[in-house]
Amino acid sequence: MEEDLLGICGFDSSKKYRLEELAKYQSGSCIEFEDDDEMAVDYPCPFCSDDYDLVELCHHIDEEHQLDANNGICPVCSRRVKMHMVDHITTQHRDVFKRLYKDESYSAFSPGTRKYLQSLIDEPLSTNHTSKSVLDPLLSFIYNPPSPKKSKLVQPDSSSEASMEDNSLIRDSTEKDWESPSPLSDTELLEKAKKREFVQGLISSAIFDHIYNF
């Protein structure tokens, strides 16, 4: 029974300590940190139920809540922000990162955490994440332009092809009919003249015979 009471008291005192430290961050009264434990304040993620220190929280939001990070309650100042949460924290609560960078506990961070913290400190005060989110659709459009619509190839109907061939044949035969005859040779002209004289002789003979008999 006594152990249960001690456990409850210990949990309440730890929770009270965390709330007091969080209040120091939010009020700005904590200017200098005398103990390393004062830096170990966990903040609740505004988009899930997990707790992180401030550097881990920013990294967690960048990795897990990139699409939801443009609107939420800041865990540091408890204000609703309508910009990228990491941009808000790095601009409005930049002094916390600088203290972390100067504190001795910085050496205890992993290389990846130190690199990420350095990038947050070196990042300009402009809304870097917001500009990236605006440029992403534009870059996507530039590097992936919409494919041009392919025109449909109309297959000619077999009946239309047959009618076109018939018209072509008729046109060719008509042109041949209207073509001027080729000039006759001298032999052909002579034979044609003889035939004409022979026919004329027959006609003349028939006429004379008719007159004579009459």
Curated annotation (Swiss-Prot):
It is found in: Nucleus. Belongs to the Di19 family. Disulfide bonds: none annotated. This is Protein DEHYDRATION-INDUCED 19 homolog 5. The gene is DI19-5. The keyword Cytoplasm does not apply. One of its GO terms (cellular component) is nucleus. Residues 148-185 are annotated as: Disordered. Keywords: Nucleus, Phosphoprotein. InterPro entries: DI19, Di19_C, Di19_Zn-bd. Residues 156-166 have a biased composition (Polar residues). Phosphorylated in vitro by CPK3 or CPK11. It comes from Arabidopsis thaliana (Mouse-ear cress). The keyword Nucleus applies.
